């Protein structure tokens, strides 16, 4: 069972995928948890998620954990498949609840009312590749699976 969950190839593909996704997602998680990088912080984020978006509080907490702890998990390669699946689900929810209504493209020229979902779709693709492939070289998963 451990090999199925933690098993991975000893290659750099998983390493580059998890570092890329983890490093891109971590600042978003830090915005939500600590208010860094112009973020609102935990209390304000929870308020937006539960009142404006109508998410149940446990779901809102899981979203925040996926973007923060999940991103850290990807960076170090711990529970890569679980962290990547969580991020894929969060990005799917972001498309469904927020960004899908704004079309495909990001708001490059400031002419849309919001951001499209192209970024989220890329993150989903990268996350699902990690779910299939695993964390790769220099991951805790690799050491656990031995």
Regions found by a protein language model. Name each.
Residues 1-36, 57-65, 69-146:
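Extended, low-polarity transmembrane helix blocks
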Residues 34-55, 59:
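Membrane-interface interhelical connector segments
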């Amino acid at each position: 069972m451990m090999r199925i969950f933690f098993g991975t190839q000893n290659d750099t593909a998983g390493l580059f995928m998890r570092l890329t996704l983890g490093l891109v997602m971590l600042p978003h998680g830090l915005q939500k948890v600590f208010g860094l990088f112009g973020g609102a912080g935990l209390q304000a984020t929870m308020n937006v998620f539960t009142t404006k978006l109508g998410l149940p509080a446990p779901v809102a907490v899981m979203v925040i954990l996926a973007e923060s702890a999940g991103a850290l998990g990807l960076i170090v390669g711990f529970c890569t498949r679980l962290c990547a699946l969580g991020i894929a689900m969060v990005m799917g929810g972001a498309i469904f609840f927020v960004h899908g209504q704004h079309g495909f493209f990001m708001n490059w020229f400031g002419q849309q009312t919001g951001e499209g979902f192209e970024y989220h779709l890329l993150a989903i693709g990268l996350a699902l590749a990690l779910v299939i492939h695993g964390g790769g070289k220099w991951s805790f998963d690799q050491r656990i699976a031995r």
